[in-house]
Amino acid sequence: MDIVRLGIIGIGNIGTAHAHAVYGGEISGMKLKAVCDVNPKRLEYAKAAFDGVKRFSSADELIKSGTCDAVIVSVPHRLHSQISQAALKAGLHVLCEKPEDVSVGRADALNRVARESGKVFAIMLNQRTNPLFKKLKQLVSSGKLGRIKNSVWIVTNWYRTQHYYDSGDWRATWSGEGGGVLLNQAVHNLDIWQWICGMPSSVTAFCDRARYHNIEVEDAATIFARYPDGATGTFITSTGECPGTNRFEVSGEYGKAVIEDGRLKLWLLDCSERKICFESERDFYEAKPSVYEYLPDEKESAHKGVIQAFSDAILKGTPPVAWGEEGINELMISNAAYLSQWKNNTTVNLPIDADEFERMLDKMAQSSESARESAKPAEKAEKQISHVGYQSRWSVNW
């Protein structure tokens, strides 16, 4: 295979941006051959925007058409696993938008199909391409900070207005989106958190429903995590603070690292703090760490970087930015946070009981208010296709 024939299932905001990137020749080794959407207005837009690209009104039609070698799945969250599984079973490579689905049970089912398929299965965790996160990952993995003691991430610059939530009936509903800020916006941060600091063994969470907006899911959340080695972590996020903050601090035995305002700052001791604690003959110790500052010399390749790596994985056998199977990790954390909230903020051990979560999520979805008459369908469709490129809010913002 010299060229990957790509189909995009779902051409709303992000799907349209992907389509323009591939159609415009920005991804080497890949050509846009088909798009699919259930909304006729989006297909009309595609007819005008993507000359020669086939259009389908259902995912099943596109998957069975024989026009594609691979697909990008960019549909509402609850359909991610179902459509991705169908594509993999049909012999197509799959790049799934985040999150992998709304629950670890559904993600696990998709992962099993992916392993059996022998096809490339990747997930759109585009913030892993950010050079600051890549550098911090390298520092922690190499042991530069020593054993991690604590991590704190305040990421409250995901501000959204009520107009945003009213732009689609599926948004911010249990039956449509399957969750709030933890599942939609902060999914990227939860992934980076576990990618760098590892998976916690337990979490206790406070997920505030409709704290800042007229919605039925959480728009603010605080997670307290404990790790197998005794380390702790705190994760705070919301879509209701303006201006917000994005500050990620990781503290270890040899110092600490902080990412904030588009730069990484590193404080390193000349020996382990544990050595200082037990060998010093003084009551107090004035630390004089070496201080380093890292400013990235490369740009975040973001979504295009993920799609390019997906193309290369198919054609060259190189790894994608994130294997699809890794998507279950951040879901494990967000699902545990929801369980903690639903069970009176009790501590939840990981891995969670997937069946229990599915039952409780279904109960929430059954009482969902997803049929809100907050925006006219025609207006929503027009909003979905009013731009052609990637929006800055989809990348790391400081």
Model-predicted regions and their roles:
Residues 1-50, 393:
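N-terminal Rossmann-like dinucleotide-binding module
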Residues 10, 127-215, 344:
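Predominantly a Rossmann-like dinucleotide-binding segment in NAD(P)-dependent oxidoreductases
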Residues 45-53, 110-114:
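Short, conserved SAM-binding/catalytic segment
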Residues 54-66:
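Short acidic low-complexity segments
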Residues 65, 70, 76-77, 81-128, ...:
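Beta-strand-loop-alpha-helix segment that lines the small-molecule cofactor/substrate pocket
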Residues 91, 118, 143, 230, ...:
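Glycine-centered short loops/turns at secondary-structure junctions
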Residues 187, 212, 236-244:
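Glycine-rich phosphate/pyrophosphate-binding beta-alpha loops
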Residues 227, 254-325, 346-349, 357-398:
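C-terminal glycine/acidic-rich active-site capping loop/insertion
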